[in-house]
A protein has these predicted regions:
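Short, well-ordered alpha-helical
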Residues: 37-189, 193-195, 225-227
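N-terminal secretory signal peptides that target proteins for export/translocation
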Residues: 1-16
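Short glycine/serine-rich loop/turn segments
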Residues: 133, 169-263
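Bacterial N-terminal signal peptides
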Residues: 15-31
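Generic anion/oxyanion-binding catalytic loop in active/binding sites
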Residues: 22-24, 94, 108, 254
Length: 263
């Protein structure tokens, strides 16, 4: 606080902003750790990418330089431990949930085959399984909502109490927000170190989604600042989320546009 007060008294506004951004970056850098396994060979993956005919995929790094991916799972450890990806429960839900439309999921919930809580738990387990796998990770997610399972359970309770849910509704289903959209439960960072702890109120759209029972599962990675400050930077890279990779070919295709984590 003393440092900031000194800056306020002795600097113009531009210098103040620059100094504060620098301090935030230094704080973030102090938490440096690796996102993947201890023996993950990032240099080997970068060498493969260097041979791609698309020069924009000649990345300089893949993992976030500022924080470990382990931060994603904080508050969700019990959910992940309860559903390892080699468990019968995971395989059962994979068949019922993966690549199903909202209408198909709602149909299964109405039949009692699935619950909203199970759907949300499965997607958390699925994200963990993919993002901790050195050969499959996508860096698609910046943050996960530790209260998502509670919200899904509440949606189940509403449905059991007689709530009418249209067959194509998103009620009770988990979605991700791009991380430049405000959501009260998670920081809205735009992928930037300067906004790493930027907690805001709900923006209009998330507020309406929540009011209609949609589960905010987390925030998707994006080109930092939604590609607003840079025209030659790698598409899909952010300091907090790392380099987003394309699920249809991690080393074959770019993740075009600023909404790279949405995949």
């Amino acid at each position: 606080v003393g440092e900031v007060t000194t800056i306020l008294r002795g600097s113009n506004f531009g210098d103040l902003i620059l100094a504060l951004l620098l301090r935030l970056s230094l704080v973030a850098t102090a938490t440096l750790s690796y996102a993947q396994s201890a023996d993950y060979d990032e240099e080997g993956d970068l060498a493969i990418l260097a041979s791609n005919e698309n020069a924009r995929m000649h990345y300089q790094r893949l993992t976030s330089p500022l924080r470990s991916k382990s931060a994603l799972w904080q508050g969700l450890e019990s959910v992940i431990e309860a559903m390892p990806n080699d468990s019968d429960d995971y395989r059962r839900l994979e068949t019922l949930v993966l690549e199903k439309s909202a209408a198909q999921l709602q149909s299964q919930v109405s039949q009692g085959t699935l619950s909203y809580e199970e759907i949300t738990r499965f997607f958390i387990a699925r994200i963990h399984a993919v993002e901790t796998d050195d050969e499959r990770y996508l860096n698609a997610i910046i943050s996960l909502n530790p209260l998502a399972v509670d919200a899904a359970r509440a949606a189940d309770d509403e449905r059991k109490a007689g709530k009418a849910v249209p067959p194509d509704s998103l009620f009770g289903l988990p979605i991700l927000l791009k991380d430049n959209v405000g959501f009260e439960g998670l920081p809205t960072t735009a992928g930037a170190a300067a906004l790493a702890v930027n907690y805001t109120r709900d923006a209009f759209v998330p507020g309406r989604l929540k009011a209609n029972g949609v589960i905010i599962l987390g925030k998707a990675n994006l080109s930092e600042w939604a590609y607003f400050f840079c025209t030659g930077c790698p598409s899909g890279y952010s300091a907090l989320g790392g380099q987003t990779l394309n699920p249809y070919g991690r080393f074959a295709f770019n993740t075009g546009g600023s909404s790279a984590g949405s995949g």
